Design a protein with these regions (language model features):
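Short, flexible loop segments at the rims of nucleotide/cofactor-binding pockets, characterized by
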Residues: 28-33, 81, 98-104, 142, ...
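Non-catalytic C-terminal accessory region of glycerolipid acyltransferases
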Residues: 1, 5, 43-45, 70, ...
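Catalytic core of membrane glycerolipid acyltransferases/transacylases, capturing the structured
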Residues: 47-107, 130-136
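Membrane-anchoring hydrophobic helices of lipid-metabolizing enzymes
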Residues: 1-55, 92-94
Length: 234
């Protein structure tokens, strides 16, 4: 009962923040979102391979992408599914692009993603969405589910490191976000085995973040569309 109450409060706060987002400033976002280890982002940027930033529909995921945009001098693009209502899509896109964040439609513009990484930029993506049934199967919260392997493929092809980060809502209404580096130095080359293993690592690390504050995760109703419990998973 308490869990549902906390979750409803979290959903309501996220919705209100989305409505208020046109009024945010760069300084306001830095005040709302404190990144605990910005030095990790800065260290990885020195490699000049670009960065793949994965978040989840957790806390205020819209602020997560905005925060990494205002905290970094590098170009940032985010992969998003277009809204079915064109007017709503234009409004949300305008809000998201206020501080230089570039929206790339899901499923297209692979060249734009590669260009961003080659220029040392950041590609942001929500990593907790339900993937097509033909995707790699990974265990997530004890269920075998298809998971997007795109981040792993881009990372293995370009050498861009993957980091995870979720905005965790605090009692005062502000957020903290801590980056976690997904290790991949031991994975040499693009192969089915390496793609599966790197996907498995980021999925399991995302689960670990969610477990710390499960009431702030918004996507549980859509993550298990294609459960394959009888299928062997990583």
């Amino acid at each position: 009962m308490h869990f549902q109450k906390w979750r409803n409060q979290s959903v309501g706060a996220t919705f209100l923040e989305l409505l208020w987002s046109p009024n945010f400033t760069k300084a306001g976002i830095k005040q709302r979102v404190r990144i605990e280890n910005i030095e990790l982002l800065q260290h990885l940027q020195e490699k000049k391979k670009g960065i793949i930033f994965l978040t989840a529909h957790f806390g205020s995921w819209e602020l997560a992408s905005q925060a990494i945009t205002v905290y970094s001098d590098a170009p940032v693009c985010t992969i998003a599914k277009p809204q079915s209502n064109l007017l709503v899509d234009r409004i949300i896109t305008r809000w998201r692009e206020l501080f230089g964040l570039k929206i790339v439609a899901m499923g297209i513009n692979v060249r734009e993603i590669l260009r961003t990484l080659q220029e040392g930029g950041i590609v942001a993506l929500a990593a907790d969405q339900s993937a097509p049934k033909e995707s790699v199967i990974v265990n997530f919260f004890g269920r075998n589910v298809p998971s997007f392997q795109g981040p792993a493929i881009f990372s293995l092809k370009t050498g861009a490191p993957i980091i995870l980060g979720c905005t965790v809502r605090q009692e005062n209404g502000n957020y903290t976000m801590r980056f976690v580096h997904v290790p991949s130095d031991d994975l040499d080359g693009v192969s089915d085995e390496n793609i599966l293993e790197l996907t498995r690592r980021q999925v399991h690390m995302t689960e670990a973040i969610i477990r710390q504050n499960p009431e702030q995760w918004m996507w549980m109703h859509k993550r298990w569309k294609h459960v394959q419990d009888k299928t062997k998973a990583a």
